[in-house]
Every structure is written in structure tokens, then in C-alpha cells.
Amino acid sequence: MRKTVSRIGEWGFRLLKHDFTTVDLFGRWGGEMLGEMAADGWHFADRTKTAAEIITDLYRVIYDAAKPSGMLILGCNTIGHLGAGLMHMNRTGDDTSGLMWERTLRFGVNTLAFRMPQHGAFFDTDADCMGIPGGIDWQYNRQWGRLLSLSGTSMFVSVKPGSLPQDQEKELGEMLRANALRRAPAEPLDWQENGLPQDWKLDGKAEAFHWYEPGGLRVGCAGGPIWERVWREVSSALDAKDI
């Protein structure tokens, strides 16, 4: 791992995103770790170290190997508190979407609001991309982009060059320029009543966002088959009064 990361830095890359390390280590996604992180009886080869120590050692090897080249580290599918100080940025939520607006709200807006306390303390937080163009109306996606651009956190955009109309491309450019300026972290104001905060303080000024479509939020299982199974298991347990 150390040699691989060092080589990538020597090639001239300035940002390395390492992903899927938690599922690689334990064989399960976070949503599958209901009570147990791995299959019954499974363990690391070195039983003299705890799982936390082994994970932290991995993050440290990646971080230290990137230092000589000055390469920045973005962790994804990582365990946040163990990565504090060992990654420059951390993707703090699940994937947002350029197709499913609900997914962007659940894993973008919610993540930005409720993982914000980690920003600047553990690492710079990244609530995932503004995904365009896709099936999401620009009037909604532009709001997500504006919030990210003024949030004080990292902003990433997934877009095919030349695919946007001129006015949208200009607006996107303004968002990216705004995000490049250092600013105070955004503060959700209605977070105690709303899991998808609509009222925010940006640069000291209150601003309201309107996330919901006229017909309401189109709710589905945005996490796919894994979360569908998790939901069935939790629902069955609740029905059986096991928890």
C-alpha cells in the first residue's frame, strides 16, 4: 500500500480518493453492520491488535505515503473518527445522485447539516457531488450547488464538459468561484425540526431553500438492495418486538 500510494504521488497526481476500505476490511457495508461488523467468527490475522488499531494503521500508511509528493487525501467509506488527522477530506455520507433528487437530499443535504461539526475538527467534510445533468430539474439542483458553494466545505461537481446550456454553465462557474473562497461553515437553523434543513445561515445571513417538488418528495429506497434488505430486517424485528 505504501509503495502504491507513493508511486501515484510521483506520477503527479495531487488528489487521491481511497474508497471502499471499510467494506474491503470487514466484508460488509455500514447498513449491514446491525450488531456485528463482520460475519460470526471472522477476525483479522493479527489478533494482538484491535480492529480500530488496524484501521488507523491503514489510514496512517496512506497519509504518510502521500506526504512527500504533497498529495491530498480524500477518504470515502471510511470510519470518520479513526481518520481524524489522517486524511485531508472525508466524504461523510453515501452517494448523492444526478438522477434521484431524493438521494441528494438524504445523502447530501442531511449529511452536510449533521456532519458539519466534524468540519475543520477531524478533516474538511465533503457531502458529495453536485451531479449534473441528469433527471433532476435545474431549479432544485442549483439550490444544492449554491448551498455547497457557500458552505465552507469541499465542493465537487460531476458534469460532462459542454453538456450544460450557457446560462447554467455560467451559474456553475460562479458557484465554483464562490466555493474557492475561505468562509465560515454553513449553519443549519431548523435542524432540530427538520432532517433536511431548509433554513441556513450562510456567511452570517439567513437563507431559505426549497427542496420539495410540487407533488412532495418522491420517496423510494435510495440505497438500493442492501438498504431494502436492512429495512425489511428492522421492520421484522420491530414487529416481533425484538428491539
Model-derived segments and spans:
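Loop/helix patches that line or flank the sugar-binding groove of alpha-linked glycan CAZymes
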Residues: 138, 142, 169-183, 187-190, ...
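Aromatic- and carboxylate-enriched substrate-binding clefts and catalytic-loop regions
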Residues: 1-134, 168
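Active-site proximal loops enriched in glycine and acidic residues that flank catalytic Cys/His/Asp
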Residues: 20, 75-77, 134, 159-161, ...
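Structural motif
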Residues: 133-149
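Catalytic cores of secreted or luminal carbohydrate-active enzymes
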Residues: 147-183
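Short coil/turn segments at secondary-structure boundaries
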Residues: 127, 159-165, 187-192
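Carbohydrate-binding surface patches
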Residues: 148-152, 156, 190-243
